[in-house]
Amino acid sequence: GQAHQFDPGLAHRGVAFVQDHRHRHQPVQRHADAVADHPVQRLNLATLEALSGARPGLATDGCSVPTFALSLARAARAFFLLADPGRAPEAYRTPLLRVREAMRRHPDLVAGPGSVDTLLMERLPVVAKRGADGYYGLALLEGPRGPLGVALKVEDGATLAREVAVVALLRALGLDPGKTPWDRPPVRNHRGLEVGHLEARLGLVWV
Protein backbone atom coordinates (compact mmCIF):
# COMPACT_ATOMS: atom_id res chain seq x y z
CA GLY A 1 0.00 0.00 0.00
CA GLN A 2 0.90 3.64 -0.19
CA ALA A 3 3.06 4.97 2.63
CA HIS A 4 1.56 7.88 4.54
CA GLN A 5 3.73 10.64 5.94
CA PHE A 6 2.56 12.31 9.13
CA ASP A 7 3.97 14.06 12.14
CA PRO A 8 3.22 12.08 15.31
CA GLY A 9 1.32 14.17 17.83
CA LEU A 10 -0.55 13.88 21.11
CA ALA A 11 -3.36 11.82 19.56
CA HIS A 12 -0.91 9.10 18.50
CA ARG A 13 0.57 8.52 21.95
CA GLY A 14 -2.28 6.43 23.27
CA VAL A 15 -3.06 4.49 20.09
CA ALA A 16 -1.72 1.17 21.41
CA PHE A 17 -3.84 1.48 24.56
CA VAL A 18 -6.99 2.16 22.54
CA GLN A 19 -6.22 -0.70 20.16
CA ASP A 20 -5.69 -3.09 23.06
CA HIS A 21 -8.97 -1.96 24.60
CA ARG A 22 -10.86 -2.51 21.32
CA HIS A 23 -9.17 -5.88 20.74
CA ARG A 24 -10.78 -7.07 23.96
CA HIS A 25 -14.19 -6.06 22.55
CA GLN A 26 -14.76 -3.40 25.16
CA PRO A 27 -16.49 -0.11 24.30
CA VAL A 28 -14.14 2.83 23.91
CA GLN A 29 -14.96 5.82 26.06
CA ARG A 30 -13.30 9.18 25.98
CA HIS A 31 -11.14 9.97 28.99
CA ALA A 32 -9.29 13.20 29.56
CA ASP A 33 -6.51 11.28 31.28
CA ALA A 34 -5.36 7.67 31.38
CA VAL A 35 -5.90 6.31 34.88
CA ALA A 36 -4.03 3.55 36.65
CA ASP A 37 -7.21 1.62 37.53
CA HIS A 38 -8.32 1.32 33.89
CA PRO A 39 -8.42 -2.36 32.78
CA VAL A 40 -5.70 -1.82 30.17
CA GLN A 41 -3.43 -0.13 32.67
CA ARG A 42 -4.04 -2.84 35.27
CA LEU A 43 -3.06 -5.42 32.65
CA ASN A 44 0.10 -3.46 31.83
CA LEU A 45 1.04 -3.36 35.50
CA ALA A 46 0.40 -7.08 35.99
CA THR A 47 2.44 -7.92 32.89
CA LEU A 48 5.43 -5.84 33.94
CA GLU A 49 5.26 -7.26 37.45
CA ALA A 50 5.30 -10.82 36.08
CA LEU A 51 8.22 -10.14 33.73
CA SER A 52 10.35 -8.05 36.06
CA GLY A 53 9.69 -10.02 39.22
CA ALA A 54 8.99 -6.82 41.16
CA ARG A 55 6.05 -4.60 42.03
CA PRO A 56 6.65 -1.37 40.09
CA GLY A 57 6.04 2.06 41.52
CA LEU A 58 3.60 4.30 39.64
CA ALA A 59 3.83 7.84 38.27
CA THR A 60 2.60 9.80 35.23
CA ASP A 61 4.90 10.11 32.23
CA GLY A 62 5.36 12.72 29.50
CA CYS A 63 2.57 11.16 27.43
CA SER A 64 0.17 11.57 30.41
CA VAL A 65 -0.20 7.82 30.90
CA PRO A 66 0.73 5.75 33.95
CA THR A 67 4.41 4.84 33.95
CA PHE A 68 6.37 2.47 36.12
CA ALA A 69 9.40 2.74 38.39
CA LEU A 70 11.76 -0.24 38.37
CA SER A 71 15.39 -0.77 39.23
CA LEU A 72 17.66 -1.19 36.22
CA ALA A 73 18.29 -4.80 37.23
CA ARG A 74 14.56 -5.59 37.20
CA ALA A 75 14.03 -3.77 33.91
CA ALA A 76 16.94 -5.72 32.40
CA ARG A 77 15.27 -8.95 33.56
CA ALA A 78 12.13 -8.04 31.62
CA PHE A 79 14.17 -7.25 28.50
CA PHE A 80 15.97 -10.58 28.90
CA LEU A 81 12.63 -12.37 28.70
CA LEU A 82 11.88 -10.42 25.52
CA ALA A 83 15.20 -11.70 24.17
CA ASP A 84 14.47 -15.27 25.26
CA PRO A 85 10.67 -15.74 25.60
CA GLY A 86 11.10 -19.44 26.34
CA ARG A 87 12.36 -18.46 29.81
CA ALA A 88 9.26 -16.38 30.58
CA PRO A 89 6.16 -17.61 32.42
CA GLU A 90 4.21 -19.77 29.98
CA ALA A 91 1.30 -17.34 29.52
CA TYR A 92 3.69 -14.67 28.23
CA ARG A 93 5.86 -16.70 25.84
CA THR A 94 3.78 -16.34 22.68
CA PRO A 95 2.88 -12.66 23.28
CA LEU A 96 6.54 -11.79 23.91
CA LEU A 97 7.58 -13.52 20.71
CA ARG A 98 4.90 -11.67 18.72
CA VAL A 99 5.93 -8.30 20.14
CA ARG A 100 9.59 -9.04 19.50
CA GLU A 101 9.04 -10.09 15.91
CA ALA A 102 6.70 -7.16 15.17
CA MET A 103 9.28 -4.65 16.43
CA ARG A 104 12.02 -6.27 14.39
CA ARG A 105 9.90 -6.43 11.23
CA HIS A 106 8.91 -2.76 11.50
CA PRO A 107 11.71 -1.01 13.42
CA ASP A 108 10.86 2.39 11.91
CA LEU A 109 7.51 2.30 13.73
CA VAL A 110 9.24 2.08 17.11
CA ALA A 111 10.96 5.47 17.10
CA GLY A 112 10.93 6.67 13.50
CA PRO A 113 13.40 6.71 10.58
CA GLY A 114 16.94 7.75 11.48
CA SER A 115 16.60 6.91 15.16
CA VAL A 116 19.13 4.81 17.03
CA ASP A 117 16.39 2.24 17.73
CA THR A 118 15.66 1.78 14.03
CA LEU A 119 19.31 1.58 13.00
CA LEU A 120 20.19 -1.00 15.66
CA MET A 121 17.24 -3.25 14.86
CA GLU A 122 17.98 -3.05 11.14
CA ARG A 123 21.61 -4.06 11.63
CA LEU A 124 21.75 -6.29 14.69
CA PRO A 125 19.81 -9.18 16.31
CA VAL A 126 18.35 -6.90 18.99
CA VAL A 127 15.15 -5.26 20.13
CA ALA A 128 15.93 -1.67 21.04
CA LYS A 129 13.70 0.87 22.79
CA ARG A 130 14.64 4.28 24.07
CA GLY A 131 12.79 6.03 26.85
CA ALA A 132 12.63 9.47 28.38
CA ASP A 133 15.43 11.24 30.24
CA GLY A 134 18.36 9.12 29.10
CA TYR A 135 16.74 5.70 29.55
CA TYR A 136 17.33 2.75 27.20
CA GLY A 137 16.33 -0.90 27.07
CA LEU A 138 17.84 -3.66 24.93
CA ALA A 139 17.00 -7.28 24.28
CA LEU A 140 19.98 -9.04 22.68
CA LEU A 141 18.62 -12.08 20.89
CA GLU A 142 22.06 -13.55 20.33
CA GLY A 143 25.72 -12.73 20.84
CA PRO A 144 28.91 -14.06 22.44
CA ARG A 145 27.12 -14.40 25.80
CA GLY A 146 23.81 -15.61 24.41
CA PRO A 147 20.50 -13.77 24.95
CA LEU A 148 20.82 -10.76 27.25
CA GLY A 149 18.63 -8.03 28.69
CA VAL A 150 20.12 -4.57 29.20
CA ALA A 151 18.74 -1.46 30.89
CA LEU A 152 20.73 1.77 30.81
CA LYS A 153 20.13 5.20 32.33
CA VAL A 154 22.15 8.35 31.80
CA GLU A 155 22.01 10.03 35.19
CA ASP A 156 21.50 13.59 33.95
CA GLY A 157 19.05 12.51 31.24
CA ALA A 158 21.24 13.52 28.29
CA THR A 159 19.80 12.03 25.10
CA LEU A 160 22.90 12.18 22.91
CA ALA A 161 25.06 10.66 25.65
CA ARG A 162 22.56 7.81 25.88
CA GLU A 163 22.88 6.99 22.18
CA VAL A 164 26.68 7.11 22.36
CA ALA A 165 26.69 4.81 25.39
CA VAL A 166 24.28 2.30 23.83
CA VAL A 167 26.33 1.92 20.66
CA ALA A 168 29.56 1.55 22.66
CA LEU A 169 27.93 -0.96 24.99
CA LEU A 170 26.77 -3.14 22.11
CA ARG A 171 30.29 -3.17 20.69
CA ALA A 172 31.65 -4.15 24.09
CA LEU A 173 29.16 -7.03 24.14
CA GLY A 174 30.36 -8.26 20.75
CA LEU A 175 27.64 -6.77 18.53
CA ASP A 176 29.05 -4.13 16.18
CA PRO A 177 26.48 -2.05 14.25
CA GLY A 178 29.16 -0.60 11.97
CA LYS A 179 29.53 3.12 11.41
CA THR A 180 26.80 5.17 13.10
CA PRO A 181 26.05 8.87 13.69
CA TRP A 182 26.80 8.27 17.39
CA ASP A 183 30.49 7.43 17.00
CA ARG A 184 32.27 10.37 18.69
CA PRO A 185 29.59 12.92 17.70
CA PRO A 186 30.84 16.52 17.81
CA VAL A 187 29.95 19.04 20.49
CA ARG A 188 29.42 22.53 19.05
CA ASN A 189 29.17 25.92 20.69
CA HIS A 190 26.57 28.60 19.96
CA ARG A 191 28.55 29.70 16.88
CA GLY A 192 28.48 26.21 15.43
CA LEU A 193 32.18 25.64 16.05
CA GLU A 194 33.24 22.13 17.00
CA VAL A 195 34.71 22.35 20.49
CA GLY A 196 34.77 18.69 21.50
CA HIS A 197 33.10 15.34 21.09
CA LEU A 198 31.24 12.70 23.07
CA GLU A 199 32.86 9.35 23.72
CA ALA A 200 31.83 6.42 25.92
CA ARG A 201 34.49 4.66 27.98
CA LEU A 202 33.02 1.52 29.45
CA GLY A 203 34.26 -0.85 32.09
CA LEU A 204 31.90 -3.83 32.20
CA VAL A 205 31.61 -5.78 35.43
CA TRP A 206 29.61 -9.02 35.28
CA VAL A 207 27.64 -9.90 38.41
Per-range role (PLM):
Residues A11-G14, R100:
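Alpha-helical structural signal
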Residues H38-T60, P66-T67, A73-A111:
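Bacterial peptidoglycan biogenesis and beta-lactam-recognition machinery
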Residues L82-V207:
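Structured C-terminal helix/loop/strand segments within mature extracytoplasmic catalytic/sensor domains
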Residues H21-H23, H31, S71, A75, ...:
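Surface-exposed beta-strand edges and their flanking turn/coil or helix-capping segments
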Residues A36, L48, S64-T67, L124-V127, ...:
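A generic local secondary-structure boundary/capping motif
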